[in-house]
From Swiss-Prot:
Record note on quaternary structure: Part of the 30S ribosomal subunit.
Gene Ontology molecular function, alphabetical: small ribosomal subunit rRNA binding; structural constituent of ribosome
Record's keyword terms, sorted: Ribonucleoprotein, Ribosomal protein
UniProt-listed GO biological process terms: translation
HAMAP family referenced in this protein's UniProt entry, alphabetically: Ribosomal_uS15_A
Protein known as: Small ribosomal subunit protein uS15
Organism: Sulfolobus acidocaldarius (strain ATCC 33909 / DSM 639 / JCM 8929 / NBRC 15157 / NCIMB 11770)
Length: 153
């Protein structure tokens, strides 16, 4: 029986750099203000990084500010309550449940839902250990649907 996933060795490596690149025209304060402005518009942290890279020419926030993007958001009380990767997995699980409601005999979707929900539980236990989630937090599909649709959060 084959392994489920390949090893995945192919990726680009960031160049080693101690300070900000010389061609970046933004100062530390300007980048932090841009991060705050984009967070107020409702962008998640990964989208903030992509917008800064693509539209403003900021390669890495950490190189310019000396701090991670989520640390900047946390200082300004704008960090999301649930970590972004966990929230994205919950969104995926909600979409699969919605699909299974329409097509209940879709066995591969059921298996996919099991895998996504087990990944949610593993990630949640890690975040509880590191203190990013409260100890009493637990995954509930009904609450997840409310979170994803925006009714709760």
């Amino acid at each position: 029986m084959n392994k489920k996933r390949a090893k995945g060795n192919s990726h680009s490596i960031r160049p080693v750099r101690s300070g900000p690149p010389k061609w970046v025209r933004f100062t530390r304060e300007e980048v932090e203000l841009l991060v705050e402005e984009l967070a107020k518009r409702g962008y998640p942290p990964s989208m903030i990084g992509m917008v800064l890279r693509d539209q403003y020419g900021v390669p890495l926030v950490k190189q310019i500010t000396g701090r991670k993007l989520t640390a900047i958001l946390q200082d300004r009380n704008m960090k999301p309550k649930i970590p972004e990767d966990l929230f994205n997995l919950m969104r995926r699980a909600v979409n699969i449940r919605r699909h299974l409601f329409e097509y209940p005999k879709d066995k591969s979707a059921k298996r996919g839902l099991e895998e996504v929900e087990s990944k949610i539980r593993r990630l949640a236990s890690y975040y509880k250990e590191t203190g990013k989630l409260p100890q009493e937090w637990s995954y509930d599909p009904a609450k997840a649907e409310l979170l994803v649709t925006g009714s709760l959060y």
